[in-house]
């Protein structure tokens, strides 16, 4: 998956980013510089990947919990990436999880190149995020984490988003097929709740939907037994032109609602 072609693409992306930076030296957001001499700003809870040298041992002694000291000059922008690792991501001739994993890598690479801190979470291990910073030199840790993900079982995005430990304002990138029963049954409300929650937590939501060709264009006719990859529930359906048209109409309506929800607010 992460072959020479992928790294060549990243190299081209890096050159394009450097070219854009040279054309607009001021940038679109404030640059951050790390330094222990800066003015103290706040505490935040320790996350795997943080520098243990920055633990506040006095706080640990009082509360028996690990907190990191942050300073005004070293407060990084946070980019949290939630990767859907449910069984449905294994569907398709070209597996959806392959594209999802590559998207996660690209987003992480761009964030690290911007000197942001990247927090990687998967839906199966919400309380075990990987937090990396320090620029592109930390990218191999991202690749190692992504290569060790396993896909299977069920996930529920709304509850997953609410369980992720967030450290402050930032960007939340959710990578999923978004084909989950709660979202499909009451899609408008579910998406609205998820997006409202993220904005309440001062996160700018970015939803990246990964679908395979077999889902976008149904190529089957007659009566079929369909099996849910996550729950193994079975459904007997008769596929004809009218049923396929209704399916595709609902699928693109679902995608449209998600896109509209992210664009608003």
Predicted features and spans:
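Exposed, interaction-prone extracellular/peripheral surfaces
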Residues: 1-29, 44-50, 59, 68, ...
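Switch I (G2) and immediately adjacent beta-strands of P-loop GTPase domains
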Residues: 56
């Amino acid at each position: 998956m992460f072959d020479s072609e992928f790294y060549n693409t990243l190299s081209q992306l890096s050159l394009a980013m450097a070219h854009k930076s040279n054309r607009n030296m001021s940038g679109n957001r404030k640059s951050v510089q790390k330094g222990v001499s800066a003015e103290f700003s706040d505490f935040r809870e320790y996350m795997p990947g943080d520098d243990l040298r920055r633990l506040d041992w006095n706080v640990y002694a009082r509360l028996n919990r690990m907190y990191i000291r942050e300073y005004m000059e070293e407060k990084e922008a946070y980019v949290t990436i939630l990767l859907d690792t449910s069984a449905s991501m294994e569907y398709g001739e070209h597996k959806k999880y392959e594209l999802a994993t590559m998207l996660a890598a690209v987003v992480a690479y761009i964030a690290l190149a911007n000197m942001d801190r990247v927090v990687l979470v998967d839906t199966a291990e919400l309380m075990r995020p990987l937090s990396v910073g320090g620029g592109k030199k930390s990218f191999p840790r991202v690749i190692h984490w992504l290569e060790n993900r396993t896909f299977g079982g069920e996930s529920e995005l709304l509850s997953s988003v609410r369980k992720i430990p967030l450290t402050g304002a930032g960007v939340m990138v959710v990578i999923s097929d978004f084909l989950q029963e709660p979202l499909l049954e009451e899609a408008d409300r579910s998406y609205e709740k998820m997006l409202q929650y993220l904005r309440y937590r001062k996160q700018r939501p970015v939803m990246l939907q990964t679908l395979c060709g077999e889902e976008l264009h149904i190529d089957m006719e007659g009566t079929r037994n369909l099996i849910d990859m996550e729950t193994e529930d079975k459904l007997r359906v008769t596929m004809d032109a009218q049923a396929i048209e209704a399916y595709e109409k609902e699928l693109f309506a679902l995608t449209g609602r998600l896109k509209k929800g992210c664009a608003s607010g």
